[in-house]
Amino acid sequence: LQQAEARR
């Protein structure tokens, strides 16, 4: 996943 998505 992208970094922004992985934070979720």
From Swiss-Prot:
Q: Which domain of life is it from?
A: Eukaryota
Q: What name has this protein been given in UniProt?
A: Unknown protein 8
Q: Which organism is it from?
A: Pseudotsuga menziesii
* Organism taxonomic ancestry: Eukaryota, Viridiplantae, Streptophyta, Embryophyta, Tracheophyta
